[in-house]
């Protein structure tokens, strides 16, 4: 069973083909909203494209990814960062709380039940006032992932906002990056 939703099998292709800057600008702006040294958990950290701007912003990063191949590349790039090879819905999140959690290009790869588990775990892992940044299409939809040929699904903006409000978040959304990825910004009350 590929806990990485097909990304372990296709890890090398993903690392070669992923646009190196997509997601960095918004993640950089988000990351600079923290005090240097703040703790941030990155779910689905992959080989560290988004992570780079968070490390550059002086944040203390923790990385979780279910693909051993992608995580190996991440560890070579950031040898000082604590990591866990686990699915986001199964990770312990290092048994600690964080100032921020980021999940770019991850949530919609998961089955709906796992998405709900991850959002709940994120709420529990964030300190009061902690911030959560993630991507998913605005529309409720399913599609086939170009790389893995597996089904992806977005629950849609109304469902995500409802779930997040129920978990004690204030939500604002509506930013889109160069790759047409839609970003949700949430702050835990």
What are these regions (language model features)?
Residues 42:
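Class I SAM-dependent methyltransferase core
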Residues 39, 130-131:
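Short glycine-centered segments of the SAM/dcSAM-binding site in methyltransferase folds
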Residues 102:
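A conserved beta-strand element that flanks and buttresses the S-adenosyl-L-methionine
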Residues 105-109:
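Short catalytic micro-motifs in class I SAM-dependent methyltransferases
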Residues 1-34, 46-93, 110-117, 121, ...:
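Class I (Rossmann-like) S-adenosyl-L-methionine-dependent methyltransferase catalytic domain
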């Amino acid at each position: 069973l590929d806990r990485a939703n097909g990304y372990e099998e296709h890890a090398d292709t993903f690392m070669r083909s992923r646009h190196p800057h997509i997601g960095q600008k918004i993640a950089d702006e988000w990351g600079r909203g923290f005090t240097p040294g703040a703790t941030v958990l990155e779910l689905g950290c992959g080989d560290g494209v988004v992570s780079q701007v968070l490390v550059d912003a002086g944040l203390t990063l923790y990385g979780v990814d279910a693909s051993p191949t992608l995580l190996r590349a991440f560890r070579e790039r950031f040898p000082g960062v604590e990591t866990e090879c686990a699915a986001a819905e199964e990770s312990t999140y290092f048994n600690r709380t964080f100032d921020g959690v980021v999940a770019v290009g991850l949530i919609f790869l998961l089955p709906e039940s796992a998405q709900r588990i991850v959002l709940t775990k994120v709420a529990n892992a964030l300190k009061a006032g902690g911030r959560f940044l993630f991507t998913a299409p605005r529309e409720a939809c399913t599609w086939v992932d170009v790389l893995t040929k597996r089904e992806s699904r977005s629950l849609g903006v109304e469902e995500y906002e409802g779930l997040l409000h129920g978990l004690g978040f204030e939500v604002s959304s509506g930013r889109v990056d160069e790759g047409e990825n839609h970003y949700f910004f949430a702050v835990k009350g």
